[in-house]
Amino acid sequence: MNIFLNASSAVPLYEQLSESIKNQILDGTLKRGQALPSMRALAAALSVSVITTKRSYEDLAREGFLYSVPTQGYFVADVNFKKIEKSIKKSIEEKLKGACYQAKKINLNAEDLSEIIRRLY
């Protein structure tokens, strides 16, 4: 599992971690039933608090990406893409909120921002 976090980002570390794990599930890097590192091991590997990994794992479980087995840890869930579509849309919306905020800071109008999105899409 390859995870890179940016401590200077405005996005909280637990959200960055959740997005990274979610993306690896969606692209097939992490497979259904695969065990994730323990919260403590992952926290140590990433030099973050256990609270960060705990929140990320719990959020991902709530969203249907992971499930927990008492005394064994967290595992990749059998992801139903229709079921998680709402979660993915919310994630996109959150990222676009950040982009809109940045655009407003430099007085970029909605049309120009839309053009950038069209170009990237």
Regions found by a protein language model. Name each.
Residues 36, 68-81:
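Short, Lys/Arg-rich nucleic-acid/phosphate-binding segment
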Residues 81-89:
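Terminal helix-turn-helix DNA-binding modules in bacterial transcription factors
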